[in-house]
Amino acid sequence: MPAAAGAAAAAAPAVDASVTPTPAGAVPIDGAAATGASVPAESAGATLVAGASTAPASAVAAPIEAPAAVAAAPADVTPAVGVSTTSASSKAASIDAVVVGATAAAAAAAVSSADTTPTPGAAPTPSIPAPTDASILAPADLDAAVTRATDALLAAQQPDGHWVYELEADSTIPAEYVLLVHYLGETPNLELERKIARYLRRVQLPGGGWPLFTDGAPDVSASVKAYFALKMIGDDADAEHMVRARNAIHAMGGAEMSNVFTRIQLALFGVVPWFAVPMMPVEIMLLPQWFPFHLSKVSYWARTVTVPLLVLNAKRPLAKNPRGVRVDELFVAPPVNAGLLPRAGHQSPAWFACFRVLDGLLRLTDGLFPRYTRERAIRQAVQFVDERLNGEDGLGAIYPAMANSVMMYAALGYPEDHPNRAIARRSLEKLLVIHDDETDEAYCQPCLSPVWDTSLAAHALLETGEPRAEAAAIRGLDWLRPLQILDVRGDWISRRPDVRPGGWAFQYANPHYPDVDDTAVVALAMDRVAKLANTDVYRDAIARAREWVVGMQSSDGGWGAFEPENTHHYLNSIPFSDHGALLDPPTADVSGRCLSMLAQLGETTGNSPPARFALDYLLAEQEPDGSWYGRWGMNYIYGTWSALGALNAAGLPFDDPRVKRAAQWLLSIQNPDGGWGEDGNSYKLDYRGYERATSTASQTAWALLGLMAAGEVEHPAVARGIAWLAAEQREHGLWDETRFTATGFPRVFYLRYHGYRKFFPLWALARYRNLRRSGTRRVTVGM
């Protein structure tokens, strides 16, 4: 899912763990590498420690040449740019001037009005400055912006045709990696630890704690893990930054306020007793599918993370921890007295009370389970992991599950050179990003995102209409084609046993867990190329993708990220689910892309029941203020873009009240500088309406794409947004974006896709150019 995949990543390990699934190995190179321009510090010299698919930076730096067969395509082929273009010569035509900016007085007035608290459920009052005293963006400048961004994106394409960018989460994943090495008693790579320590210190807040997203509030669990990792690496507990961290943790109630996954980590190191961890007996593995707690009733990410944890809970091993590091000083009271956490805000009081009683009963009876039953349950858990180990791409292709599988094998006495333990351990190294540039840092990714990155980059390039860009997009899709999962019936068969496989995973390989969102986006791109080049080379792939996506539709008409009907909401009230991320219910963003796919493939709400049900679901999910919730991207801007693209593809007229309300909402939240922004605070349980945040390139692009899907290409606010993107573009052709704009698990785990600021702005600029040149308001593709 853009996230969708991203999703899986952090889930189970929730609060601190990762989010999106993806394994693999490649070298994320910033698009500027081949242009001769300066490369952003954050990605220059970054190396993904990965496997065979990794290419040396030098191999990626050269611009991609269009394959001769594609470059020589017939001149009368219409570029798949999302709108009807007129002729090849029209690409040289000038476009109307783009209005940029506003007077200082108008901007000040807008800022003043923006401070007004919005009425709950109502669209915020528009506060967009009028386009007075404007400067003009010449048509040639817009063309140049598209060209520079295209150059940068092409330069980042891997030799085999795909794209993969860094996927950054918060401090918890690199901290957990450090702790894992010492848990296993391995000899640490001191240079790597030094770089990770630099990263952890840099993302520490001035107040001492660590946040879940840029400029966010300190999070006690993230802070405990980061402090523990730094102390394990060798930072003096009396160092200024460590004292600040300790004080911040105490101010949040101490380490005893940590979430379940942090408590498990502390229990493994002997800091807290296992009593502080909710009971999760391994005998769960033996329950029948109809049972309320069967594993098929939770999400894929929760399943892959939890199964090895069940074994750890049964074995309760103690970390080797050769340096003997402890963090008792982070507790307000003695850690040995740590009890269970109270009910979380998302949990039902009644259900939680029932489950807390059950937790107590399980503690009383834990020693009474027959030994042979426990051993049988452990064997079943190991079998589950073995079957899904996924080679060097790892269990579930997400860090938490992969790390837990390594610890499980170690707890069961598997030697380091046992094939399963060894390959599980190697899979973690492929998630490392090591910067050898001036930043001199390293961190561990929650997963890898090559399928997501490649499919979205292809869409952006197709939008430009340039032959070289289209050729590169085709190379990317040709790389994707053999990755379609056609012969593995994954865990989704528990709900849809008669559906044939046909999806794509989020990562390089994850055959048991294809991703609905990725599959829809890949099929959309392949269909664009099929129409552009008048080819049927992707016909079978698209047909199987459509068949599988329709098979994954839930009974309410929507789609979850990985499986249908994953809506057993009572499970998020068990003590183990303080993170609230056990489930994968249908969401508007994923459902919007599935409807977009069906509509682009020619299905209408009149001739296709799946499309009709999807439209009904999407319209029912619209918020009172006109927006849609964004599960995998941050947040309502992302969800609203996803929904508007689908409504346009489904043929809703621009004057439909639902479309107009959504467009008005986007217009009303534009920042005075012309961009759009939103942060993780929008996921809080007491959210009452949009809260302004710093403009970002990716969110501005989403808002613009949404407005253009709503027929608002001529609106002055769109011109201001386009001008903002053009003004923020750097010499290397890309955009700077340090803020997190994606979501692994709301309120728990957020993501920063380094590719988002590269392909989404290009996509928006190119679409704007296409619509203005063609003189039409209607976008003719699904995304």
Q: What residue spans do the PLM features occupy?
A:
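Preference for long, amphipathic alpha-helical scaffolds in soluble/luminal domains
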Residues: 1-16, 20, 25, 30, ...
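Intrinsic disorder/low-complexity segments
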Residues: 6, 36, 40-47, 62, ...
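Conserved positions within tandem-repeat grammars
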Residues: 21, 26-27, 41, 51-52, ...
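Intrinsic, low-complexity polybasic segments
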Residues: 46, 51-52, 62, 102, ...
